[in-house]
Regions:
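Bacterial N-terminal signal peptides
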Residues: 1-10
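Sec/Tat signal peptide C-region and signal peptidase I cleavage site
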Residues: 12-16
C-alpha cells in the first residue's frame, strides 16, 4: 500500500495509509513515486547535521472543494542527525481555501472552493539566484539561505539556514503567496502573503483575507493524539504565579486563539520518544501579525484551530462544522489539523491612488500571516550547540 500512497501524494491526492511507528523509509520507492523530491542537508556547507526530505507538487484542477488548487507539500520527512532514521512529519499540507469577506457584508469570496484559482507564473525576477533562488517549475520557487541568528550567548553565536518553497495563487486582482519554510532545526512555517490591486470599483472597502490550512500531520506514523495548550495567569494575583495546561482532545473539535492564553496545538505519537525518554511532539503555533485573528458570520471562522479524524474526502474548510459533527474520536488516530490565519486590510494611500479620471493605480504591498510547527523534545538536545551530550 505504501507504493500506492506515495503515488497519490505526488499527483496531488492525499491518501494516508497506516505505517508502523519507526518504520524505515523505503528510499527507492519514495524516489520512484516522488521524482521531484528535495533532499536538503543543513548546514549547506560542511558535514550534514540535519536533513529534510520533501515531496511537493502542484494542483490545478476544477474542483478545489475535493482537491484544493495550489502548492501541495508532502509527504515530508526529517532526520535529526546523520545516524538517525528519517521520521515522517506530515503527509499533505496545503491551503484549503481563502475566504475574503468585505465589511459592507458583500462580496464574500471563496477564492479556491468557488473560483478554483491556480498558481501564477514565476520567473528569475521572482526567484533570483542572489538570494539562493532556483525555479523548480514555471510556478514554484525554491530558496535556500541564511535565516538569521539561531542562538547567541556569552561566548559564541550561530546563524541558521532554511529552505523555502513558494508559489502564488492568481486570484484575479490579488496574488496569494503560498510560502512554506523548512528550517535547519526541524521547524516548519506556513505563510500567507496577500498582495495585488484593491477590489476594482471599490478600492477603499475594508476587508479580511483569511487562509485556512489543512495539515494531514503524521508524526512518526498515523497514530497521533492532540492536546490544547494554553497559558493561564491572573494579572491581579499578587503571588505572580502562572499555569500552563495541556488538555487532551478526545473528540473532533475546534477552539479559538487568544493573545493572553497563547493557545496552541500539541501533536504526539504514543511510542515516539527521544533518548531522554520524553514524549516527542510538534506544536502548531500561530504567527499572528496585525493584532489578531478575525471571526465572521460563517461558522467555520468561529474557531482558529480544528482537529478532525483523517478522511480523504474532507478538504473544504467551510465544511469544518460538519466534519466535527457527532464528535468523532481523534485520540490515537490518524489526524488532520486545521489553522486559520487572518489579515485585516484597511486600505491606505500606499495601496494606490485615483488619477484625475478616477482610475486606480497601485499595488498593495505584501501583508503576512501564518503558523509554525515547532519541534518539542524531538531532539535529545540541541545538535547546534556543542557539545550535545
Amino acid at each position: 500500500m505504501l507504493v500506492v500512497t506515495l503515488l497519490l501524494a505526488w499527483t496531488g491526492v492525499a491518501s494516508a495509509q497506516p505505517v508502523a511507528a519507526g518504520a524505515a523509509l523505503d528510499m527507492s520507492r519514495f524516489r520512484l513515486f516522488c521524482p521531484n523530491a528535495i533532499t536538503q542537508n543543513f548546514p549547506t556547507s560542511g558535514p550534514a547535521e540535519t536533513t529534510w526530505l520533501i515531496c511537493w507538487g502542484e494542483v490545478a484542477g476544477s474542483d478545489s472543494v475535493a482537491n484544493p488548487n495550489g502548492l501541495v507539500i508532502g509527504p515530508v520527512y526529517f532526520r535529526k542527525s546523520p545516524s538517525a532514521p528519517f521520521i515522517r512529519i506530515l503527509w499533505d499540507m496545503r491551503v484549503s481555501d481563502y475566504f475574503v469577506p468585505y465589511h459592507p457584508g458583500s462580496p464574500r469570496y471563496y477564492d479556491l472552493s468557488i473560483y478554483n484559482f491556480v498558481l501564477t507564473g514565476v520567473t528569475a525576477q521572482d526567484c533570483p539566484a542572489s538570494v539562493g533562488g532556483a525555479l523548480l517549475t514555471t510556478h514554484v520557487c525554491k530558496e535556500v539561505h541564511d535565516r538569521g541568528l539561531m542562538w547567541k550567548d556569552f561566548s559564541g553565536v550561530r546563524r541558521g539556514e532554511e529552505l523555502v518553497l513558494w508559489g502564488a495563487i492568481d486570484a484575479a486582482n490579488y496574488r496569494y503567496i503560498q510560502r512554506y519554510v523548512f528550517r535547519d532545526d526541524g521547524t516548519i512555517e506556513g505563510w500567507l502573503g496577500a498582495t495585488g490591486q484593491n477590489l476594482p470599483g471599490d478600492e477603499l472597502a475594508t476587508h479580511v483575507h483569511n487562509a485556512i490550512w489543512r495539515i494531514d500531520i503524521d508524526l512518526d506514523g498515523v497514530t497521533n493524539s492532540a492536546s490544547h495548550l494554553r497559558h493561564l495567569e491572573n494579572p491581579a494575583n499578587p503571588a505572580g504565579t502562572a499555569l500552563d495546561q495541556a488538555i487532551a482532545l478526545p473528540v473532533a473539535q475546534g477552539f479559538g486563539w487568544s493573545a493572553r492564553t497563547h493557545d496552541a496545538l500539541e501533536i504526539t505519537h504514543p511510542a515516539f520518544k527521544n533518548a531522554q525518554g520524553h514524549l516527542a511532539a510538534y506544536h502548531l503555533m500561530p504567527l499572528v501579525t496585525g493584532g489578531g485573528l478575525t471571526q465572521h458570520y460563517e461558522a467555520f471562522t468561529h474557531n482558529d484551530f480544528w482537529v478532525t479524524p483523517y478522511n480523504p474526502g474532507q478538504f473544504a474548510a467551510k465544511n469544518l462544522p460538519m466534519y466535527v459533527a457527532g464528535s468523532p474520536p481523534v485520540m490515537a488516530r490518524d489526524l488532520v489539523i486545521w489553522y486559520k490565519g487572518s489579515l485585516h486590510h484597511h486600505p491606505r494611500d500606499e495601496d494606490g491612488a485615483y488619477d484625475v479620471s478616477h482610475s486606480w493605480t497601485g499595488t498593495a504591498h505584501v501583508m503576512w500571516t501564518g503558523f509554525m510547527l515547532l519541534p518539542h523534545d524531538f531532539f535529545d538536545c540541541s545538535p547546534f550547540y556543542k557539545p550535545c551530550p
